[in-house]
Design a protein with these regions (language model features):
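Membrane-interface micro-motifs in multi-pass membrane enzymes
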Residues: 49-53, 108-152, 174, 334-357, ...
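Perimembrane helix-loop-helix junctions
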Residues: 182-210
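Membrane-interface alpha helices of multi-pass inner-membrane proteins
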Residues: 161-176, 181-187
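Transmembrane-helix motifs of polytopic, lipid-linked glycan transferases
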Residues: 82-104, 150
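Membrane-lumen/periplasm interface segments of specific transmembrane helices
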Residues: 22-26, 30, 204-295
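Short hydrophobic/aromatic helix or loop-helix immediately within or flanking a transmembrane segment
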Residues: 46-82
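Transmembrane-helix signature of polytopic, membrane-embedded enzymes
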Residues: 95-122, 158-161
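Membrane-interface transmembrane helices that cradle and orient dolichyl/undecaprenyl
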Residues: 145-161, 193-199
Length: 418
């Protein structure tokens, strides 16, 4: 009996440990009200239109029937977050086990990177703070984690790409932002199948391209082909007010469904760049997260050093293309003001990529992991200090990037006075 229990524990120990840590984070730090700006998407569904941002509300309606009060809406969002916690626990657990299976000596560096993620302000904890709880980002994160799990666990390329494509379309149906904030991570992971062992696998490349074309077509449809069956945002509010007591800001509905990009550029973006100093906020965030950025830079330095040492053709491997996927974030930073929501997956992506390629037995990433562990053994206190430092930082917000970054800016512009 004890042996069976021990075997069971060995099968779930990493996943359960990660799940419990993140669950405690969620229970103890979550906000208690759904974000007001995004509240309408809890009740908007396909009976009111077609296109993006209506899928989640349609699923919710299968359970609540005719009326969704604030308490029930909050519960639904919490359930979505907990499912996301399960998904990220399975992803990290699978990665750790795959690494240990072929290189047990890399266990410490693998677990260390997971701990780094869990402590960081760009971990999934950003999904439940005051700025973001109740947003559709919860489900974008979930789709991203499920896609990574597919790429990790399924070997058949046709089944793998089919599932990733279906999940990608679902992500776009949830919110078009999936194309910019989580799909780049999935493309970076797909490069492991296309450029494995420094040679192009034509079959895998064709499947990846087909998947990408479908995603682009779906994005264009959801971005430009969908809409609501109403002529004015106030009409939408009147209908929704019969279904819920959630806040229903007319501005959010008007901006998303009744205004074009020119209006956004001439009003929101102009004032955002002029008044809220986004590049200054970004610079301060980078300073606060400098220890993490140094880890990332050294990681990629080691990857390319391995390529040079082994005289590998750079563009025959996946690494340049993996780095280029980060450029896909640029349009959403240029078109939207909620930079905190986009920075979190951008920063977190490097950890997922490192662990994914390590789990896939990538030689260059294996070399980078070895060098990383050498540095940790030489300066263990530096790594411990990094974990403790980033653990003190608040999770990323939305339009206000990160609390400590704004506090630093405010101090240097206003001193001690309000």
């Amino acid at each position: 009996m004890m042996k069976k229990m021990l075997n069971l524990w060995n099968k779930v120990s990493y996943e359960l440990g990660i799940f419990l840590v993140v669950l405690v984070q969620f229970i103890t730090t979550r906000a208690y009200d759904v974000d007001a700006w995004s509240a309408p998407w809890n009740v908007l569904d396909y009976s009111m239109g077609n296109g993006s941002r209506l899928l989640v509300g349609s699923i919710y309606r299968l359970f609540y029937g005719d009326y969704l009060d604030q308490v029930e809406a909050y519960r639904y969002n919490c359930v979505g977050i907990i499912i996301g916690i399960v998904a990220v626990s399975l992803v990290f657990g699978r990665m750790i086990r795959m690494v240990i299976a072929y290189t047990p000596e890399k266990r410490n560096v693998t677990v260390g990177m997971v701990i780094l993620y869990l402590a960081a302000p760009f971990s999934m904890s950003y999904l439940w703070n005051n700025s973001n709880i109740g947003r559709l980002d919860t489900y974008l994160f979930l789709v991203g984690m499920l896609s990574l799990l597919v790429l990790l666990c399924i070997k058949n390329i046709y089944v793998k790409m089919l599932l990733v494509t279906v999940l990608g379309v679902a992500g776009l149906a949830i919110h078009q932002a999936y194309a910019f904030v989580y799909y780049p991570l999935i493309v970076a992971a797909m490069c492991a199948d296309v450029f494995g062992e420094y040679k192009v696998n034509v079959k895998n490349l064709v499947m990846a391209v087909i998947s990408g074309v479908v995603e682009i077509a779906a994005f264009l449809y959801f971005q430009f082909g969908g809409g609501l069956y109403y002529d004015h945002p106030q009409q939408v509010v009147e209908v929704l007010s019969q279904r819920t007591d959630l806040p229903l800001p007319t501005d959010s509905i008007e901006l998303e469904y009744f205004r074009d990009i020119t209006y956004v550029q001439n009003t929101l973006l102009r004032s955002f760049f002029a008044e809220e100093k986004p590049f200054l906020q970004l610079a301060v965030v980078c300073v606060l997260l400098a220890p993490v950025l140094i880890i990332y830079v050294l990681m990629w330095k080691d990857v390319f050093a391995y390529n040079k040492r082994e005289q590998k053709k750079l563009f025959c491997g996946p690494y340049v293309y993996v780095l280029l996927t980060n450029l896909v974030f640029i349009p959403i930073f240029a078109m939207q003001t909620d930079w905190g929501r986009w920075l979190a997956p951008l920063f977190a992506g490097q950890i997922f990529i490192f662990l994914f390629y390590l789990a896939k037995k990538d030689a260059a990433m294996y070399y980078a992991a070895s060098k990383m562990w050498e540095r940790v053994k030489k300066a263990p206190l530096a790594f411990a200090a990094t974990i403790m430092w980033i653990g003190t930082l608040d999770s990323f917000g939305a339009r206000s990037f990160q609390q400590q970054a704004w506090a630093v800016i405010y101090f240097f512009t206003h001193g001690f006075h309000q």
